[in-house]
């Protein structure tokens, strides 16, 4: 009679990486449940997470290294050994570096994000400035908008202490299972919720106020809310006078965005705009929760988000209890994430075209120009791509990018499934799922969790970092951290927290780090903002300096796609809105 054992592990289909109790029988995954020891989950999983068996045992999984045996895009591959695969990669990437220079090779990371620091280390060891990720069309645009104002990493809302929560393009029930649990508990507590979303979602249904705007008009709505807040004297004068740069110009600009005018632009009734502004500014502390991509997936996307983020500053809700806060809970230092810097001694993709991207420390190449650097005569040409989870379907002009992938001298994709993008590759390598590998997780509140390997890797699939280590060893690339082995790498990540890998493994429910950094608020009182002015910049000096050369504007100026594009709106009245999460679907390594 087979015995069922429960393995503490994680689901890494999407960013939150929910903790999972995996039920294993005879070495096979038999079922999954959300971990019950975590307050945010309480045993819950989304539809994708609950379908783990369909995901892990999908018949379309790539299980062996596969070398192209036909024309690019034809989809004909032959099975080879890992030694042959490593030899093929080393031979081609070393040849291309010798012939064209290291910058002619791109190192690309899709999802999940756990292996990104290791891939960046590989790019650095190779000598290429062209480490890039799917965030070129996703999160980094939102992060850039934030940094242009505050100069630091994005600060989410201090959820346990908010009195008003404004959800801007954030459908928690479909995109963040742990956070949706906290959201439900806050609703029971009686907080006010304003939801900004073109769609009537489950989250919007629960809100006190739903601002159902026309897609792409977020900037006009935010500027109109600012107009009301300033006009009705609801802004935080003390904070603005002491810590904000460019308020006068900002104030003058927003005066034109009355709720009456904004109603015509956004479709949101003027009275609802006024009510939302008064609620957010007057019933605080208030926090804004935003998502990575829907707002920025439009013309003027970065400026639209800058208009949204500016509301936090003018109401004094920055880095205060219940507002958008840098460190609302204890935290613990770790190595790797955000610590590995990109090799920048040569020009990267997009550096001439998007200088603010690099000035604002995105610390990766701007991959939106990848197809151009392959197909056209740019400053230099990209000849090779080493990718982990590249899917052309998420990029603008996807067919052009797929065509470009077919023109490369050499292209590797590490994947779970044989996507169209993988069919263009010279070599496809099999990655394993989170159920087939070990991993350490640094979580909110300074908590750490060891994700156990529930089952052995299917076929000859490997974890992504072990693949990176294998390639680097074969190529003779040097990195003192990675080449010590995977266990040593996990140990290295944990070292600043004051815990060992062995300790963490002995705490199946997770454990607190030892070198805790306490919560903080109003850090700006002792430390200046990391902006050129040392203040919150409603008028960005970084963007302003590129006004003449690139047309960037320091204020969060609103440009309407309906009046500034040549598309016939009568013939094409519909507006594409992207970036939402479908609760029951995933695609390759995207969710």
Protein language model features and the residues they cover:
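A cross-kingdom feature strongest in bacterial/archaeal respiratory oxidoreductases
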Residues: 2, 6-10, 162-167, 171-206, ...
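Conserved short loop/turn motifs at secondary-structure junctions
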Residues: 105-113, 264-268, 291-298, 331-332, ...
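N-terminal export/assembly segments and adjacent metallocofactor-ligating motifs
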Residues: 1-232, 261, 269, 473
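N-terminal leader/propeptide and maturation segments of large enzyme subunits in energy/redox metabolism
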Residues: 64, 68-84, 98, 227, ...
